[in-house]
């Protein structure tokens, strides 16, 4: 599970990542990344933590399917959060196909999107 201190929870933070960050889409998800954003909510920290949030709409499926997708995405981000620059804000938005995708497909799409956002991947 993704640690609590690495979770994106505030509406303003989601809006910042989506509106001011870069975006890469894949078949099952879209990833928004705002690199090196400072956290105004933690003024005492010297190195701001990278935080991730997830958006899974009703278009993905019923509640059980949406929650399954969210759990899978949180688990996948836990292993990848250290690859991102400190202070980054990441929003992973699941597309309707994510409900039918298996864990491996979500992992491939997330890896491809992050690689592209970090400048190491081709289209």
Swiss-Prot record:
Gene Ontology BP terms: tRNA 3'-end processing; tRNA 5'-leader removal
A GO-annotated cellular component: ribonuclease P complex
Gene3D superfamilies in the cross-refs: 3.30.230.10
Protein's gene: rnpA
Role according to the record: RNaseP catalyzes the removal of the 5'-leader sequence from pre-tRNA to produce the mature 5'-terminus. It can also cleave other RNA substrates such as 4.5S RNA. The protein component plays an auxiliary but essential role in vivo by binding to the 5'-leader sequence and broadening the substrate specificity of the ribozyme.
Gene Ontology molecular function: 3'-tRNA processing endoribonuclease activity; ribonuclease P activity; tRNA binding
Pfam families named in the record: Ribonuclease_P
HAMAP family to which the protein is assigned, alphabetical: RNase_P
InterPro entries assigned to the protein according to its UniProt record, in alphabetical order: Ribosomal_Su5_D2-typ_SF, Ribsml_uS5_D2-typ_fold_subgr, RNase_P, RNase_P_CS
NCBIfam families: rnpA (TIGR00188)
Protein name per its UniProtKB record: Ribonuclease P protein component
Record keywords: Endonuclease, Hydrolase, Nuclease, RNA-binding, tRNA processing
Enzyme Commission identifier(s): 3.1.26.5
Catalytic activity: Endonucleolytic cleavage of RNA, removing 5'-extranucleotides from tRNA precursor
Subunit structure, interactors included: Consists of a catalytic RNA component (M1 or rnpB) and a protein subunit.
């Amino acid at each position: 599970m993704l640690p609590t201190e690495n979770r994106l929870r505030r509406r303003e933070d989601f809006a910042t990542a989506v509106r001011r960050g870069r975006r890469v889409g894949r078949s099952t998800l879209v990833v928004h990344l705002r690199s090196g954003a400072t956290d105004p909510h933690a003024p005492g920290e010297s190195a701001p933590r990278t935080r991730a949030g997830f958006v899974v709409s009703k278009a993905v499926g019923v509640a059980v399917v949406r929650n399954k997708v969210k759990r899978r995405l949180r688990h996948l981000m836990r292993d990848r959060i250290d690859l991102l620059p400190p202070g980054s804000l990441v929003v992973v938005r699941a597309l309707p196909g994510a409900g039918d995708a298996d864990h491996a497909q979500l992992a491939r799409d997330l890896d491809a999107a992050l690689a592209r956002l970090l400048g190491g991947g081709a289209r």
